[in-house]
Amino acid sequence: MKLHTLVSCLHDFPVVPKENPEITSIEADSRKVKEGSLFVCMKGYTVDSHDFAKQAAAQGAAAIVAERPIDVDVPVVLVKNTFRSLAVLADYFYGQPTHKLHLIGITGTNGKTTTSHIMDEIMRAHGHKTGLIGTINMKIGDETFEVKNTTPDALTLQQTFSKMVEQGVDSTVMEVSSHALDLGRVHGCDYDVAVFTNLTQDHLDYHKTMEEYKHAKGLLFAQLGNSYNHNREKYAVLNSDDNVTEEYMRSTAATVVTYGIDTTSDIMAKNIVMTSGGTTFTLVTPYESVNVTMKLIGKFNVYNVLAATAAGLVSGVKLETIIAVIKDLAGVPGRFEVVDGGQNYTVIVDYAHTPDSLENVLKTAKQFAKGDVYCIVGCGGDRDRTKRPIMASVATKYATHAIYTSDNPRSEDPAAILDDMVHGASGKNYEMIIDRKEAIHHAIAKAKADDIIIIAGKGHETYQIIGKEVHHFDDREVAKEAITGRLNNEE
């Protein structure tokens, strides 16, 4: 593709050189540049790839996209924002693949992963070959890949969509992070359905204020409907019980469908009953009301199911198909996942890493707990410090015993993170154990019959970041090891 043809998709008045070389690939990593590449420079948090433009040119780059003039011997296209330009260029270069997909985007603080997995199952049951992009993994049909970010970088994203189309995928569900929206990674993505789960405190190390965080999430809905395929109706699926929904309603040009429990909505759940074995409720839709029994536990999972149900219905899936999927749902790795080693107490691993998600998990555990509730929780280093005392407060409020421990301390002193947390502790029902493995073993050693242990924060993650080192660490493995060790000692 010729350079002038490619950059014609940019609408922010780029400064385009006279030269018009052939472009054979797009790269954002100078180490991957080869003959014919278009190298896009981006200023990140720690590295500014404008500094590698000469290296890219030396490796054969045919042209460079930058935010400032660069002294190189190849054509330079100047744009205002290279992050957003990369997304639009990649979409155009790969043939605008999302035009050929039914694309469902899910955003919100909590519930994105579970909702996306439920939605993937619903679309499969409807006969689609599906794609899935999310926190845990990426799927193309039945093939699974590891991921680094909730939402991949723009180039990887469009390459993935292109691969999905090539392999016959016709419906894709993806988690859309606030970072991806703010940085413009999803510019060029033609969403058919956008789903909002909820908005609670998180990522304030990046967004600084809740107002900025709310605005970033809202971009998915503000941009929905202002897109390419005007012959396809767009839908915004919004949680009526969240107080930002009215603002998102006003910002979108799409058709709005609501779901909720406490507020009158298009899709509702009533008569909710929870036990340790699952949840039953009445699913109320504009078409009919149906009694539903599912294995998933917790009010938060009812919200996830309602969101997926609404998205499924606007995607043309029959209600009976959706109900059948809900009844068979087995859960998502690291989301209220029970670790069973034959013990007489319950151990649950959950990704809860925000005050709201931790409160939801602990409230759910208390609803069916016959004994004490333990909560093992930490807060990430180099991340939002303001939520540390709040997390600690939630743990001591809802758990019988709270254990504060490490959770990816990164460059910070783990003891200092725990000190920040302790400021929010109410009461004396907590202890601090810096070593996460020791904390898990300690709780499991103390647990009595019918107690519940919640190991919060990591969920599906299999690593612990200490300094710049990434160590293997899986809460589920450590818990199973501790359970087995205790059982062996008791024999």
Swiss-Prot record:
Carboxylation is probably crucial for Mg(2+) binding and, consequently, for the gamma-phosphate positioning of ATP. It catalyses: UDP-N-acetyl-alpha-D-muramoyl-L-alanyl-D-glutamate + meso-2,6-diaminopimelate + ATP = UDP-N-acetyl-alpha-D-muramoyl-L-alanyl-gamma-D-glutamyl-meso-2,6-diaminopimelate + ADP + phosphate + H(+). GO terms for molecular function: ATP binding; magnesium ion binding; UDP-N-acetylmuramoylalanyl-D-glutamate-2,6-diaminopimelate ligase activity. It is found in: Cytoplasm. The modification N6-carboxylysine is found at residue 217. Keywords: ATP-binding, Cell cycle, Cell division, Cell shape, Cell wall biogenesis/degradation, Cytoplasm, Ligase, Magnesium, Nucleotide-binding, Peptidoglycan synthesis. ATP binds at residues 108-114. NCBIfam families: murE (TIGR01085), PRK00139.1-2 (NF001124), PRK00139.1-4 (NF001126). It comes from the Bacteria. UDP-N-acetyl-alpha-D-muramoyl-L-alanyl-D-glutamate binds at residues 30, 149-151, 177, 185. This is UDP-N-acetylmuramoyl-L-alanyl-D-glutamate--2,6-diaminopimelate ligase. Catalyzes the addition of meso-diaminopimelic acid to the nucleotide precursor UDP-N-acetylmuramoyl-L-alanyl-D-glutamate (UMAG) in the biosynthesis of bacterial cell-wall peptidoglycan. The gene is murE. Pfam families: Mur_ligase, Mur_ligase_C, Mur_ligase_M. Optimum pH is 8.5. HAMAP family: MurE. Its cofactor is Mg(2+). Its main location: cytoplasm. Belongs to the MurCDEF family. MurE subfamily. Meso-2,6-diaminopimelate binds at residues 383, 407-410, 457, 461. Its EC number is 6.3.2.13.
